[in-house]
Amino acid sequence: MEFRHHVRKLAGLSMIGCSCAGLYSYQDEGMKRSVYFWRHAFPIYAHYRVYQLLMEKIALPVDKQKQIYERLHEKHASHVFDIVLSLKGFYIKLAQAGSTRADFLPSQYLTRAVKLQDEAPSKPVSEIKYIISQSLQTSWDNIFTSIDPKPLGAASIGQAHRAILKDSGEEVAVKVQHPDAEHFFRSDMKTIKAFCRYFQPAHLPYLEEVEKQFMTEFNYHEEALNLEMVRDNLKKSPFASRVAVPTPKIEFCTKEVLVMEYLRGKKLLVGIQEHLECIAKERGMSLEELRTKQQKMDEERLAMGLDITLGPTQFELKALAVKRWIRLRYLQLLNCMPGNLVSKPLEIDCDKELNKKLLNVPSILKLLMDVHGYEIFVDGCFNGDPHPGNILLLEDGRIGLIDYGQVKRISLEHRIKLAKLTVALAEGSREDIVHALTVEMGVRSAKMNSYFLEKQARLMFDRDDLTVTEGMNVQSFVEYLDS
């Protein structure tokens, strides 16, 4: 086992050498990116891997392992994100995917990853206007009165701006693809797949699917058609009055440019952040103290095999809202009393504070699960890349769903098979899960081991918390399954 491991390391190092030689031969930008990745990312991976193997070999207690991993995270997190921000593209996409996993990603990485959900590096508006003019084959100002220089958000392959249509005066969002985004993605995928082939082969099938699915994001005209289809489907759903999908302006959509209805609201994460700040303030705690307390409660519940809590109950939320309203109005009254009219010693804008809404987070999460479940099992047409950066809390109280670049379609036959597997995972035994996976869905493995099949089904279609991975981190558990 150790021999094979060292062979893999040598092969990886040899590949770096070959890449460096190739750089001088071809001077291709994609090759430069590959060399940069291997030169900067591989030593970080090796540092983690060596410590992992050493700790396993000497059977170091879990608490000691956590301390060592914390030091490694502190040392490497900033360097990892320097690599991400330097290479952009697919690496930002990976960071965005990681940002949704607070239960998995260490805090040193999570805080940086969350910022990349809609704050990825952006290009100046002058370049955006040039791309629009080239793609639409007319000057941008023939279509738009103005384009806001500040991006609404920037993602892995492009960015979005608010604009005003010249003919109608309507406010729209304009999504523009960065030049070379597709070329760099193809090159980066080769690099990542090569890395996994040598060091994390269990992840290769997942990467193959990611590559296939992500390629659909490079045609914004197709995304406009996806928006139309999903929007029409949801208008016929039980959630029509509670969710909104923007209407695309098909006549202005090309492979590189997508023009659509502008939805007024804030990012879901911004709303939840304000919600948590309000709760912390009412409980006399800092936001960090609230998070620490909640994390401890979650760990205790998971250790007992219980689901984590998603927030205050409906009754607790109403009681908290009333208490908060009374406190803020009382402070407002104090500020208006004689003697305080000029100096206003209480530095608080009560009206602004009251505009920060307390959210029924469990209700919002249930709605999102219901909507995406409806897309999958009823419509057979769903967003293959849902993450918090693509979800808005609209001013009218609805949930806004944006970014349908990755839309997956599945037949009724496959939906039925997937539904049977989902029910088995939720309610059935190992035998039920294996039956749904192998007999119904036709999945095969080398040894057809029932333990292996059940765990793979849970990792892919259910969850990957410690109750599933038996106390190991996901990477170690996947390697354990492969062995």
Ranges and model annotations:
Residues 378-388:
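Catalytic-loop of the protein kinase fold
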Residues 200-205, 235-249:
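Conserved HxN/HPN-centered segment at the entrance to the catalytic loop
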Residues 163-166, 386:
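Conserved beta3 strand of the Hanks-type protein kinase catalytic N-lobe
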Residues 389-393:
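Hydrophobic residue at the +6 position relative to the catalytic HRD Asp in the kinase catalytic loop
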Residues 149-152, 166, 170-177, 181-186, ...:
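ATP-binding pocket architecture of kinase catalytic cores
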Residues 1-159, 167-171, 183-214, 297, ...:
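N-terminal accessory/targeting segments that precede structured cores
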Residues 120, 125, 129-133, 231, ...:
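Short pocket-lining segment of the protein kinase catalytic domain that shapes the ATP-binding cleft
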